[in-house]
Every structure is written in structure tokens, then in C-alpha cells.
From Swiss-Prot:
Residues 32-43, 370-385, 406-428 have a biased composition (Pro residues). Residues 1000-1093 form the dDENN domain. Transmembrane segments: none annotated. GO terms for molecular function: guanyl-nucleotide exchange factor activity. InterPro entries: cDENN_dom, dDENN_dom, DENN_C, DENN_domain_containing_2, Tripartite_DENN, uDENN_dom. It is found in: Cytoplasm, Cell cortex; Cell membrane; Recycling endosome. The lineage of its organism: Eukaryota, Metazoa, Chordata, Craniata, Vertebrata. It comes from the Eukaryota. It comes from Mus musculus (Mouse). Interacts with ITSN1 and GRB2. Isoform 1 interacts with the SH3 domain of ABL1. Its main location: cytoplasm. This is DENN domain-containing protein 2B. Residues 1-90, 233-273, 289-571, 633-658 are annotated as: Disordered. Residues 695-843 form the uDENN domain.
Length: 1134
């Protein structure tokens, strides 16, 4: 048996007449497949709004079951509220009679209806037997979707019908728990009525059920069932409808499969059982499609499943609200029986319809919908010739298809679109992208079903003046500006990563491949420390190789696989590539497939970007240290971490080593309290970027003392002149007095010479406030004949760029050789030149007699840290083991003194050792060549790095120097040391550092024929990469612990940063190293910088964070390891 209930039906009553009825429009829900009925031959015309009316009835009226018209626009009729004591008003449709009304008084009708209700069956499982209709039967228009539920009827016609239906019901194998009879009254004007219970006069169609004691029809339950479950019916094609002009056009009902054949009553009305079956219709449609696969869908009439043009212009969808005591049974628009409209009976909703459906609350409608057909090159059958039972929540609905039960998707009025004659084209959002460009990325629900092409235009990136692309505006307000590289943002891949998006087969089983470990871990590093979990991925993503990412319509699946929220700090390189791929960065729109594609693409780009030499260096560190780098830390564990865990003997550390570590920590803290707080060189350069290229240019000459046979250095030429006696000028005069000492640190050893090859060196001046100035010197013999004393050309600048000023000194030397008067105009034009940005070139116009006007181009390199560094000289003077000890002493900011015979050796080795500290900068006193007259500086209690000539060594030994490391560069030995230099660094990292430096020649030769970066193939590049990797291993995770305060300021989480490291030896090293001013200046620089270009270290850090594996132990392994540590500790104590 079948049962349907319509919530959008029209009530039409009228007096007799045989005119063809006018159709009424509504939406209906169905709980079972409706019968397939033949279309009427009479023309069907839709009603206009003026012809439609509706009546409202009280919810407590049990004697009359009526439904209002959903399309009524008559406010006067809608506002009526008749009392239960009076007969309900009758809705008329002009003069046209729609149904036959009983002429008995309304009181008689109510009495008959009460008798009908008494024997009704309460439960609804199956649904109503519908009687055949004549050709002129009303409600059979193609656009009609409603049938009247009424309890009115006459005793005259009901007796014979009761006998016939009783005979038909007697042939059933099982009696349904409840039946609902749609009855057709014979007469000039026919009327449909549905009554409950067998003893009713109005509907003697069903045998009473044992559970028919209740007298009230539960229309609420019927609403709930009809809203929840539905089996859709599919009307016949137009060809079949046209093929039946001569047949009897009675509509007939076909029962569900598994039930008995139609009753004798249906046969009595001339119904053909076999030809009208749903199965036969389906078979014919399938056969027609198989014979002509290219023909596509059969063209449906304009009145099928929708209103025609005249109606569509004025009609609106009915609302979902309905009086409590009303219900309806509706025929399918094409089938004409008691059934709902098929789910695919109509084109996909337009943009407005889709938006209104998304805004619908889950409580409004939980209407099911059909699954989309399997993807195939041929267009899908519309209607699909195979009904399916589905259930979906409202949030899961696909707005591209109509609800299968025909209910309006939302209470918002909207005109249903007509059914197109051809399949709908793929939906593209390109023309509308400007209309919704203002929407925020968090509000992505309306973009769930976008195609990839529209997503690629959501976040267009704009080129900046540097030639790179600016980061789009994402949901989070702040990003990690320190990752704004100028040199690593690559081009967009030519291939489209969304070419293989499967738009239809979204419910098929996922043929998955697991996200690679590196790609998945790279996503971990993009999260904030609070969100990041090192123990497991956020979800075990089951990812398809062919990404079907962006049109996954099942929102409940997406919610169950939701990723953790991305942090405010994204890697700029990741975000730039995401912008290029047009992937949104909001959590609701990054699903697993897009992450798979993006992560693999990111890792592949970065693996290509890492030079082979760097990969070999990294492999050495990985082999020595292992895979585990960071451990899982929650905020509670950071606060309650015990000292026992910090100092447990898990790495064979002895008590003596722990005591030495504690003493070292106390020593560096006490020493740094006495040292002034210096600022980083980078911050100083930021303040001077708008100033001149250099501060002073001086010429220093040796003058003989009158009383002695010795020479003293003096400034013989100065540019510019210090005219105004301001405070800055007085400080500049003090510096000028010290400059000659650094230009001639060995002045007492000089005598006039006839020949001398020019020598270039540099020094650094550190002010009381920590400001630094570089001195670039060229020592040479002036023009003339005979023995003479050399002189030094010196340029004082805040810019640390040795190559640029070497070119300036070459030009000065050339002009000085012609005439000293030519130096002044050149230096003036140079001072008026702008301060060059990294990688930029400035042009200086000069005039030279005999050569005319000239243009001198001065280029500042992108990275000048290795420009004036010669590691070859450093390895010539020192062994690898000695160099690592010196490096460790400098990291802990100890006092270091170099001693050498030559000025150039001291200068080269001092600058090279400081360059090993990159990305950190030495914050304390740094004098590559200390004049003998200033040797007392080595007695100061603060850290320093100074170089002394061998002639000053006897005096040095007499001075009361505190703890310091004295290195003789000529003999490769330590003059004085502290005996713990081998234990300052983590032992595994120290072993990797030593091995990589020992194999430097082998590593360079392996890459000599490769096409990798030329900079890395040099000795300077290799040594720099080896030490950079050391810092990456120790502090490379610092960016994960830079948080933003409410004011937008950055703050570094020191304890969380240190305790996140898995290795205890590295944690102990960090505990001391984090007290240094080098580390403080490094973090301060990262906290204060806004948007600046990054160097090599940030690139290597990003690559390192992608390599981090997920190695958090399980609870049992952690327990066993802790137990082993305790046993070892007790064993050592005993």
C-alpha cells in the first residue's frame, strides 16, 4: 500500500460541471513510490495568482481536513480563522467547478466524518489506495501536485466502493497497519477524498486494523514521516505519453514490488495491469537510452515538473509553516496519483535557490535527496529511472539538485525554474567572482561547491616593487613577516593540480595514498605551539591520488575530517604558494585532498631548491644525531616539568659534568651582568639606511717624534671637516683620535722604506652604546722617490661591505697617484650618493683629467656576510679540533685572544671566526688588530675578541688577564685555556660538525661538476653551511615559539622553546647559550622586525622544519624509558 502526504496542497471545492479543471501548483512529499499514471488528453493551463485562493483552518478541527494553497497571495483569505462550530469557508476558483460538493448540510457532513474517524487506523506504514480517474478528472494537470484530503462523502456512492475495495483488500497477503484511501467520487464534477477508518461513510475502502481504536488522525506524525523518508516515482517520458492517444486514459495505481497484484476493482475499471507498471516504463526508458546513447535525455513537456512561463513569472514557493491539524495527499505532477515529485524533476537550482537552501536551518526540512548518478560521458537520465531511498541531514544537501520529496528548500519565496530541454551545463562561478570578492575567507560555506577555476581567482596576488608577490589577506590578521623572503618565492608550476578533480564521483570509495611523512609534518610546523601535537597527525588522512578536493558536497564528512586551525604565523613560502595555487587558508576550506596536493608540491619544490652539498651536510648531521628533534609539550607539562627530568642521566652524563654545567651557567650570568647591553648590527643598519654611505674618510701618516727616533700615526687629511662643535662632533673627534692607532697598530716598528706592496685590512670600532663602525684601510707608499714612510687611506662606515669599499679605495688610490686634489671631489660625490639596498647598485659620476666624465658603479651584494671572509687562512692556521673549541668558547661569550706575526693574518682569522657565528652577531668588544698602546683592554672583565701581534706577547703575559682563551695562530696551539672547551657543545652535534669539516675537500669535489649553486661549491660556502646547520639543529625551531600579544607585539616563549628539544645535552647547551647577548639580540631582532628580506638561515630553518619527523613515544615506551633511567641512576649512586 502507498501513502503520501502533501504539505503544500490546495483545497478546491465547487459545484458540478464537466469543464476541464485548471491546475494548481504545490510541492509535496512522499513516503513511497507513486503510481505511474497516464497523462490527460485535455489541455492543461496553469492558474494565475488571481485564480488561486487558500483557506486557513484551526488546528483543533478534527472533522474537516483541509489544506491551504501554498501559492495563495490573497491576504484576506489567509487571514480567515473560522470557528469550529461553523462550516469552513469554501475556496472557489472563479466560476469553474473543481469538484463535486455534497449538497447535504454541513452538519450532516461533520457527523459522517466523525463516523469515519472512529474506525481509522492510526499508524502509517504504507499508503493509500488510489482509485482510477476519468479523463476529465481534476488535479491531473501536468503541473498539479496536490490532491484533496477530505472526510466528506456520501453514503450513496460509498457502499459499492466499500464492497469492491473490501474484495480487493481481501486479496492482500498482509494487512497494513494503516491505510489511507484516496477516493474519486463519480459524478459530473469529481472530488477526491481521503478518509481514515473503514466504517466511515466517506471512505469505505479499507478493512479496519486492530489498532484503529483511536479516532484522531495523527497528521504531525504523517508530517514527520513524509519529511524523513521518501521513495521517489518517475513519470513517463513524453514519447510514451504521445503514444497513447487512443487508449483509455484512466489513471491507475501500481502497487510496490513485493505486494500482490492489483485488485478486482482496478480490473473492473478497465485498467491494464502490465502495461502501466513502473517496471515496464523503466525498462522502456532504459532500452531507449541503450539504443540511442547519443540522443541524451528525452525532451519533457514544458508543463512537466514545473509551471510554464506564465505561471513562473508570478508564482512563488509556498512556505513551510502549516497549521497543526492539516495534511494533504498530492499526486505527482506527471503521474497524477497519490505520490510525490521525483527528486530530479527539475533543473538544478540557480544561485538564489542555492543560497536560500544553504541558509535553511536543520529544523526546517530534512528532506532526502537522490544520490547523483555515476559519472559517465553521457548525460544522466532525468528523471533517474531507479528510485532509491536516501536520508540526509539538511547540512548535507547538494544545492545542485532539488529535494526528492518536492518540498521547497526554505521559507524564502523563490520561483521554481523551468526544466531545460538539454542537460544543464557545468556550473562556473567566474562571472560572479567580483560579486562575492568581499566575503571573508572564514565564511566559506557558500563556496563549498565551487569549481577549481573559480577558486584560482579568489585570492589574486599582486606583484610588489621587489618583483615578488605580496601575501594575500587571509583570515588571520597577522602572518610571519620574518619569512618574507625575497629570493625563494618560486614561479607557479605549469601543470594544473586540479585537472583530475572528480566532480561527480564524490561518494565513491576513496582510493587513497597516505600523505608522505615529510609533507604531513610540514603541515604540523605551520601550526601554533598550542595547536601543534607532536605525538600524532591531526587525523589519519585517507587521500586520493586524484584530488577531488574542492567539490566535496558532504559537509558532515568535511566536519568529521576537519583540520586543526592554522595559526596566525604561516610560513611565507607556504602562503605564497598557496596563494598561487588559489587555495584558501581558512580551516573550513582546506580539506584533505587539497592539503595532499599542496604539501607534496611544496616539498617537491623545496627538495629541488636545496643544493646537493647542503643535502650531504644534512645527512651527516642526521646520521650523528638521529631523527628525534622535538618532543610533545603541552602548556601544563611546560609549567610542571621537573628538574629530575631535566637532569636525569639518560645520555651517560656524569655528576661532574652536571656540576660543570651549573658553574658555567652561573659564570656567564654573572659576567653578562657587568657587560653593557648591545644592539644587533641589523638594527643599527636599519636606522642608517636613509643616511650617507660613509661617515669619514681620513688619510693617516706617520710622523716622527722630536725627542725620540720613533713615529706616531696622525690624521693628515680628513673629509668632511668637523666644523660645528656639537655633541656628535665631539664624539666623532674622540673616534678620530682612536682611528690612527688602528691604522698603524705597529707604528713603533716602522722605518722609511723604498718599496712596499699595498695591503688591505679592516677593523671595527664599538661605541659605549654598542654602536659599531667598520674601518676599511689601504696601506701603501705615497708617490715619490727614495725611502719614505707608508700612509693609510681609511673609510669609516656603518655598512659592513668589504668589496664595495675596496672598490672605493682602488679609485682613491688611482686619483691620489695623479694628484691629492682629485680625491676631494670624488669623495664628495660619493657621500651624496644614496645608501644602497641589498642587491642594488648606485652610480657615482666623477670627472678625471685626461679621461673626462666617468661613472663608477657600486653594488651592494644580497648577502655580504662572507664577502671579506677568508676561511682558507683560518684552516691554514688552525686544525678542525682547535677551531671547534674556539667556536664553542665564542658561543658562550668568553674572552678570546689571537696572536699572529702578520697584520693580515690577524685580521683575516678574526673576521672569519666571527663569520662562523652567523646568524648571530658578536655583541662585545671586537678588535681584529689591537694596537700595542691599547693592550690594557685585555684586562677588562667583559667578553672580547682581540688580535695581537707577536711583538706584544711578552707584555701580554705580564698582565693580570682573567679567564681567557689565548690562541697562537702561527703554531696552532693554545697559550692559555680553561680545559672544558671540548664539553661546551652537545657531543653528537660536535661530532657531526667535526666530521663535516674534516671531509670538506671531499664534499666540494663531489659537487664540482654538478649544476648546483656556485656559492656552495666554494670553501667559504661549505664551511658556512656546516655551521649554519649546527644552529638550525639547536635553535631552528625558534619561530614556532614566537607568539603575538593583544597589542600585536611579538613575544618569545623561552622555556617552551628550550623544553621542546628532545635531547637533554642540547637543552643544557641552550640553557647557557640563551643567557648570552648574542641570542638575546637575535630574538630581539626577530621580535621587532616587521617586513624584511630574509637570508640564508631562514631558508635552511624552513627546510629543517619540513624534515622534522613525528617521533613522540607511546605512553608505555615512555614509562619503560623512565624506569630504565631510574635504574641507571640508582646503579651509579651505588
Amino acid at each position: 500500500m502507498t501513502m503520501t502526504a502533501n504539505k503544500n496542497s490546495s483545497i478546491t471545492h465547487g459545484t458540478g460541471g464537466t469543464k476541464a479543471p485548471r491546475e494548481t501548483l504545490s510541492r509535496s512529499q512522499s513516503v513511497s513510490p507513486p503510481p505511474v499514471l497516464y497523462p490527460p488528453r485535455s489541455p492543461i493551463y496553469p492558474l494565475s495568482d488571481s485564480e488561486t485562493s487558500a483557506c486557513r483552518y484551526p488546528s483543533h478541527s478534527k472533522s474537516q481536513v483541509l489544506l491551504k494553497d501554498r501559492h495563495s497571495r490573497n491576504p484576506s483569505l489567509l487571514g480567515q480563522d473560522p470557528s469550529p462550530e461553523t462550516s469552513p469557508p469554501i475556496c472557489t476558483l472563479k466560476a469553474t467547478s473543481f469538484s463535486y460538493l455534497d449538497r447535504t448540510p454541513s452538519l450532516r457532513k461533520r457527523e459522517d466524518q466523525k463516523e469515519t474517524v472512529q474506525g481509522a487506523v492510526q499508524d502509517v506504514e504504507g499508503v493509500a489506495a488510489c482509485l482510477p480517474l476519468a479523463q476529465s478528472t481534476p488535479f491531473l494537470g501536468a503541473g498539479s501536485r496536490s490532491v484533496l484530503l477530505s472526510c466528506t462523502g456520501t453514503r450513496a456512492h460509498s457502499l459499492g466502493i466499500r464492497e469492491k475495495i473490501s474484495a480487493w483488500e481481501g486479496r492482500r497477503e498482509a494487512s497494513p497497519r494503516m491505510s489511507l484511501c484516496g477516493e474519486k467520487r463519480e459524478g459530473p464534477g469529481s472530488e477526491w477524498s481521503v478518509s481514515e477508518g473503514c466504517p466511515s461513510v466517506g471512505c469505505p475502502s479499507v478493512v479496519p486494523s486492530p489498532c484503529s481504536s483511536e479516532k484522531t488522525f495523527d497528521f504531525k506524525g504523517l508530517r514527520r514521516m513524509s519529511r524523513t523518508f521518501s521513495e521517489c516515482s518517475y513519470p513517463e517520458t513524453e514519447e510514451e505519453a504521445e503514444a497513447l492517444p487512443g487508449r483509455d486514459s484512466l489513471y491507475r495505481l501500481e502497487k510496490r514490488p513485493g505486494r500482490t497484484e492489483p485488485s478486482a476493482l482496478l480490473r473492473g475499471h478497465g485498467i491494464r495491469k502490465e502495461s502501466s507498471a513502473v517496471l515496464s516504463r523503466i525498462q522502456k526508458i532504459e532500452q531507449a537510452l541503450k539504443e540511442q546513447p547519443g540522443r541524451g535525455l528525452p525532451q519533457l513537456p514544458s508543463s512537466c515538473y514545473s509551471v510554464d512561463q506564465g505561471r513562473r513569472k508570478t508564482g512563488t514557493l509556498g512556505t513551510l509553516e502549516e497549521p497543526t491539524g492539516t495534511a494533504s495527499v498530492s499526486p505527482s505532477s506527471r503521474a497524477g496519483g497519490v505520490a510525490g515529485v521525483a527528486g530530479e524533476a527539475g533543473p538544478p537550482l540557480d544561485r538564489e535557490g542555492s543560497a536560500s537552501m544553504k541558509s535553511e536551518t536543520p529544523g526546517n526540512s530534512s528532506s532526502p535527496q537522490l544520490l547523483p548518478p555515476k559519472s559517465s560521458p553521457d548525460p544522466a537520465v532525468n528523471p533517474v529511472p531507479k528510485p532509491k531511498r536516501t536520508f540526509e541531514y539538511e547540512a548535507d544537501k547538494n544545492p545542485k539538485t532539488k529535494p526528492s520529496n518536492g518540498l521547497p528548500p526554505s521559507p524564502t519565496p523563490a520561483a521554481p525554474p523551468p526544466l531545460p530541454s538539454t542537460p544543464a551545463p557545468p556550473v562556473t562561478r567566474r562571472p560572479k567572482k567580483d560579486m562575492r570578492g568581499h566575503r571573508k575567507s572564514q565564511n566559506r560555506k557558500s563556496f563549498e561547491f565551487e569549481d577549481a577555476s573559480s577558486l584560482q581567482s579568489l585570492y589574486p596576488s599582486s606583484p610588489t616593487e621587489n618583483g615578488t608577490e605580496s601575501q594575500p589577506k587571509f583570515g588571520s590578521k597577522s602572518t610571519l613577516e620574518e619569512n618574507a623572503y625575497e629570493d625563494i618565492v618560486g614561479g607557479l608550476p605549469k601543470e594544473n593540480p586540479y585537472e583530475d578533480v572528480d566532480l561527480k564521483n564524490r561518494r565513491a570509495g576513496r582510493k587513497s595514498q597516505q600523505l608522505s611523512e615529510n609533507s604531513l609534518d610540514s603541515l604540523h610546523r605551520m601550526w601554533s605551539p598550542q595547536d601543534r601535537k607532536y605525538n600524532h597527525p591531526p587525523m589519519q588522512l585517507s587521500l586520493k591520488s586524484n584530488s577531488q578536493s574542492l567539490r566535496s558536497g558532504n559537509w558532515s564528512e568535511r566536519k568529521s575530517h576537519r583540520l586543526p586551525r592554522l595559526p596566525k604565523r604561516h610560513s611565507h613560502d607556504d602562503m605564497m604558494l598557496l596563494a598561487q595555487l588559489s587555495l584558501p587558508s581558512s580551516p573550513s576550506s582546506l580539506n584533505e585532498d587539497s592539503l595532499s596536493t599542496t604539501s607534496e608540491l611544496l616539498s617537491s619544490r623545496r627538495s629541488r631548491r636545496i643544493p646537493k652539498l647542503v643535502q650531504r651536510i644534512n645527512s651527516i648531521y642526521n646520521a650523528k644525531r638521529g631523527k628525534k628533534r622535538l618532543k610533545k609539550l603541552s602548556m601544563s607539562s611546560l609549567e610542571t616539568a621537573s628538574l629530575r627530568d631535566e637532569n636525569s642521566e639518560s645520555e651517560s652524563d656524569s655528576d661532574d659534568r652536571f656540576k660543570a654545567h651549573t658553574q658555567r651557567l652561573v659564570h656567564i650570568q654573572s659576567m653578562l651582568k657587568r657587560a653593557p647591553s648591545y644592539r644587533t648590527l641589523e638594527l643599527e643598519l636599519l636606522e642608517w639606511q636613509e643616511r650617507e654611505l660613509f661617515e669619514y674618510f681620513v688619510v693617516v701618516s706617520l710622523k716622527k717624534k722630536p725627542s725620540r727616533n720613533t713615529y706616531l700615526p696622525e690624521v693628515s687629511y680628513q673629509f668632511p671637516k668637523l666644523d660645528r662643535p656639537t655633541k656628535q662632533m665631539r664624539e666623532a673627534e674622540e673616534r678620530l683620535k682612536a682611528i690612527p692607532q688602528f691604522c698603524f697598530p705597529d707604528a713603533k716598528d716602522w722605518l722609511p722604506v723604498s718599496e712596499y706592496s699595498s695591503e688591505t685590512f679592516s677593523f671595527m670600532l664599538t661605541g659605549e652604546d654598542g654602536s659599531r663602525r667598520f674601518g676599511y684601510c689601504r696601506r701603501l707608499l705615497p708617490s715619490g722617490k727614495g725611502p719614505r714612510l707608508p700612509e693609510v687611506y681609511c673609510v669609516i662606515s656603518r655598512l659592513g661591505c668589504f668589496g664595495l669599499f675596496s672598490k672605493v679605495l682602488d679609485e682613491v688610490e688611482r686619483r691620489r697617484g695623479i694628484s691629492a686634489a682629485l680625491v676631494y671631489p670624488f669623495m664628495r660625490s660619493l657621500m651624496e650618493s644614496p645608501f644602497p639596498a641589498p642587491g642594488k647598485t648606485i652610480k657615482v659620476k666623477t670627472f678625471l683629467p685626461g679621461a673626462g666624465n666617468e661613472v663608477l658603479e657600486l653594488r651592494r651584494p644580497m648577502d655580504s656576510r662572507l664577502e671579506h671572509v677568508d676561511f682558507e687562512c683560518l684552516f691554514t692556521c688552525l686544525s678542525v679540533r682547535q677551531l671547534i673549541r674556539i667556536f664553542a668558547s665564542l658561543l658562550l661569550e668568553r674572552r678570546v685572544i689571537f696572536v699572529a706575526d702578520k697584520l693580515s693574518t690577524l685580521s683575516s682569522c678574526s673576521h672569519a671566526v666571527v663569520a662562523l657565528l652567523y646568524p648571530f652577531s658578536w655583541q662585545h668588544t671586537f678588535i681584529p688588530v689591537l694596537p700595542a698602546s691599547m693592550i690594557d683592554i685585555v684586562c677588562c672583565p667583559t667578553p672580547f675578541l682581540v688580535g695581537l701581534l707577536s711583538s706584544s706577547l711578552p707584555k701580554l703575559k705580564e698582565l693580570p688577564v682573567e679567564e681567557a682563551l689565548m690562541v697562537n695562530l702561527g703554531s696552532d696551539r693554545f697559550i692559555r685555556q680553561m680545559d672544558d672547551e671540548d664539553t661546551l657543545l652537545p657531543r653528537k652535534l660536535q661530532a657531526a660538525l667535526e666530521q663535516a669539516l674534516e671531509r670538506k675537500s671531499e664534499l666540494i669535489s663531489q659537487d664540482s661538476d654538478s649544476d648546483s649553486d656556485d656559492e656552495c661549491n666554494t670553501l667559504n660556502g661549505l664551511v658556512s653551511e656546516v655551521f649554519i646547520r649546527f644552529f638550525v639543529e639547536t635553535v631552528g625551531h625558534y619561530s614556532l615559539f614566537l607568539t603575538h600579544s593583544e597589542k600585536g607585539e611579538r613575544a618569545f616563549q623561552r622555556e617552551a622553546f628550550r623544553k621542546s628539544v628532545a635531547s637533554k645535552s642540547i637543552r643544557r647547551f641552550l640553557e647557557v647559550f640563551m643567557e648570552s647577548q648574542m641570542f638575546a639580540g637575535f630574538i630581539q631582532d626577530r621580535e621587532l622586525r616587521k617586513c624584511r628580506a630574509k637570508g640564508l638561515f631562514e631558508q635552511r630553518v624552513e627546510q629543517y622544519l619540513e624534515e622534522l619527523p613525528d617521533t613522540e613515544q607511546s605512553g608505555m615506551n615512555k614509562f619503560l624509558r623512565g624506569l630504565g633511567n631510574k635504574m641507571k641512576f640508582l646503579h651509579k649512586k651505588n
